[in-house]
């Protein structure tokens, strides 16, 4: 978002300044057990960016991120207890702007339908979604540049 301010100088000449203010986004973070340390390291590396936004995470992942970053995390239940379903509900209501879900593709999960539902909903509602570190880094840097501000327009328009 850009804000333009008109300011009068001492000679009553109009001076125009433009400041940029990034929209605060709601970011969902989930990590399978084998990826939790990777998620912690990701959160440490990008703490400065994450601190400018509201972070939502499944229970254990959120607690682990809080421990290493001191960020305030809105925590759902643990993933296998319904946390992924809680995130899915927020996605359906257009309350999440981006999801980083560090998945372990080698270990099948008993709650795999919940995982697939999150993926399906992100695709349905055009929520930027990463399942690996490379894509997560691209998204977090795009977030920092303001490349995801189009999400705010969608929310305002009720889309």
Model-derived segments and spans:
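Short, acidic/small-residue loops that bind anionic groups at enzyme active sites
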Residues: 119-139
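Glycine-rich beta-alpha loop segments
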Residues: 21-54
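Mid-chain, well-packed structural core segment of small domains
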Residues: 84-120
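Short internal beta-strands
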Residues: 53-61
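Short hydrophobic/aromatic-enriched beta-strand-loop microsegments
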Residues: 54-55, 71-82, 150-153
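N-terminal amphipathic/basic-hydrophobic helices that include classical n-h-c signal peptides
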Residues: 1-17
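Short, glycine-/small-residue-rich phosphate/pyrophosphate-handling segment
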Residues: 134-159
């Amino acid at each position: 978002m850009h804000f333009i301010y008109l300011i009068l100088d001492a000679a009553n000449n109009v001076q125009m300044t433009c400041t940029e203010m990034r929209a605060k986004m709601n970011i969902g973070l989930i990590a399978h057990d084998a990826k939790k340390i990777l998620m912690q390291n990701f959160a440490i590396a990008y703490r400065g960016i994450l601190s400018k936004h509201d972070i939502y995470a499944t229970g254990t992942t959120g607690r682990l991120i809080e421990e290493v970053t001191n960020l305030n995390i809105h925590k759902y239940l643990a993933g296998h207890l319904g946390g992924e379903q809680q995130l899915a509900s927020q996605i359906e209501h257009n309350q999440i702007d981006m999801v980083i879900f560090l998945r372990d593709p080698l270990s099948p999960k008993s709650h795999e339908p919940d995982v697939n539902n999150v993926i399906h909903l992100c695709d349905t509602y055009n929520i930027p979604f990463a399942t690996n570190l490379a894509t997560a880094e691209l998204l977090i840097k795009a977030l920092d540049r303001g490349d995801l501000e189009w999400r705010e327009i969608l929310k305002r328009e009720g889309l």
